[in-house]
């Protein structure tokens, strides 16, 4: 700098100093925030299209509200061994998820039961739903939604941008229930009854359909409340039911 004074006027040096001090201050502030384990879950879409999740992009999504634990995060990568349309495929990836979940999440929880997870999933929908089942509501976790248009895991806003409502349709007497989650697209009842002999249909619909129907944590909370309310209603009205059909058209964060 001393040898090239004309290239570094006082204003530029002061701006460099300010940016450096701001960066140091931001890092120091993170010391006092809660740590979180980044959990990145991937499996080829439709069994053919590989996906990758950037650790840096995930870290940017959680900071500065949380501090990232470790330098690489936790990865659950489920490899495909069978044809996507075969029953062997789902049996294989389900076993793979069980095994990797035990090796990562369960192992961490055994050491630190109160640990917080930030979850970043890119995988076929049934596999993500199984991941949600495995984590349950006892594990402290926040799920993030990938935006393909912005190539980012950051929420688009902090405000609620969508609303969710439920509808019940009784087709005939009986206790065979289907739960239809119409968030990214509206699913017609005939598409359900063509493949599932349902007596009762429960729909949860987004006010605004589309891949961007969940744009914030507030949207996710609103959907979750309506989902819990419908599940409670099914349980209370049909207590003897042990199985229902689930038909999802929804983003990964809601799964």
Predicted regions and their residues:
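Long, low-complexity, Lys/Arg-enriched
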Residues: 2-255
């Amino acid at each position: 700098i001393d040898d090239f004074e004309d290239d570094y006027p006082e204003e530029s040096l002061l701006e460099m100093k300010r940016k450096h001090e701001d960066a140091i201050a931001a890092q120091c502030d993170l010391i006092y925030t809660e740590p979180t384990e980044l959990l990145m879950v991937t499996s080829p879409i439709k069994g053919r299209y590989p996906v990758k999740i950037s650790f840096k992009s995930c870290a940017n999504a959680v900071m500065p509200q949380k501090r990232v634990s470790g330098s690489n995060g936790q990865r659950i990568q489920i490899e495909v061994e069978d044809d996507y349309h075969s029953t062997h495929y789902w049996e294989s990836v389900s076993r793979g998820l069980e095994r990797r979940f035990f090796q990562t999440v369960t192992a961490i929880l055994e050491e630190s039961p109160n640990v917080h997870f930030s979850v970043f999933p890119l995988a076929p929908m049934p596999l993500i739903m199984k991941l949600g089942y495995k984590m349950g509501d006892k594990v402290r976790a926040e799920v993030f939604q990938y935006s393909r248009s912005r190539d980012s895991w950051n929420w688009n806003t902090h405000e609620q941008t969508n609303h969710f409502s439920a509808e019940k349709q009784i087709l005939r007497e009986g206790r065979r229930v289907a739960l239809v989650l119409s968030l990214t697209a509206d699913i017609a009842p005939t598409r359900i009854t063509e493949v599932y002999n349902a007596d009762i249909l429960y729909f949860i619909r987004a006010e605004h359909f589309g891949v961007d129907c969940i744009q914030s944590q507030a949207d996710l909370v609103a959907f979750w409340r309506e989902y819990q309310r419908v599940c409670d209603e099914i349980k209370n009205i049909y207590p003897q039911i042990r199985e229902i059909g689930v038909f999802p058209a929804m983003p990964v964060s809601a799964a």
